[in-house]
């Protein structure tokens, strides 16, 4: 993990809502370790001169869908292409300043681990896996002629769970698959 000191920047103070100068910021790996007015003493850190640019904490997107760009795509686009697309979306999010995202349905543990292991460049992810919905609910994207009783809908992006026992089972399955939270689309 790298160790960096950022200097020569306008530091955004998010509590006061102002830009401040004369500060240095020490980052180790993906963590801000120290923010100090004046010099930070860390001889093993690489110093990066930001040339007067603005430095701010990473943004957090609390409702993203990196795996499903359009729900209608799920009917005609294979999961492998959707995963390839998600790598582009994740990289673009980093470039826009997002360092953490909460994916609210679609992305799973494999997407999260692809970022953590460096296969994809992207922000830290908290994933929901498959969206839970009841038959005919907001997350049931099956076509009117689709009478599948397999509990999956929309290429596995959502899952149908009717009744308490089915919901309990669906939640346990999603947790078993490594999700960080459960997304429910009822109604």
Language-model segments: what does each one mean?
Residues 9, 25, 30, 52, ...:
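Divalent metal-coordination and catalytic microenvironments
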Residues 13, 63, 105, 129, ...:
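Residues that line or immediately flank small-molecule/substrate-binding pockets and catalytic motifs
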Residues 38-56:
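Active-site metal-binding motif and surrounding structural segment of the metallo-beta-lactamase
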């Amino acid at each position: 993990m790298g160790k960096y000191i950022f200097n020569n920047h306008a530091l955004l103070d998010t509590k006061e809502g102002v830009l401040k100068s004369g500060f240095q910021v020490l980052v180790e790996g993906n963590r801000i370790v120290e923010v100090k007015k004046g010099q930070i003493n860390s001889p093993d850190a690489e110093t990066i001169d930001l040339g007067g640019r603005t430095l701010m904490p990473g943004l957090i997107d609390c409702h993203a869908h990196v795996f499903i760009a359009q729900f209608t795509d799920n009917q005609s686009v294979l999961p492998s292409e959707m995963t390839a697309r998600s790598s582009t979306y994740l990289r673009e999010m980093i470039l826009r300043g997002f360092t953490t995202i909460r994916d609210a349905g679609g992305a799973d543990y494999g997407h999260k681990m692809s970022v953590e292991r460096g296969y994809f460049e992207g922000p830290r992810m908290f994933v929901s896996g498959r969206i839970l919905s009841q038959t005919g609910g907001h997350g049931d994207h099956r076509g009117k002629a689709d009478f599948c009783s397999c509990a999956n809908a929309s290429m596995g992006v959502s899952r149908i769970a009717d009744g308490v026992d089915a919901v309990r089972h669906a939640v346990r399955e999603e947790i078993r698959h490594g999700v960080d939270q459960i997304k429910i689309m009822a109604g």
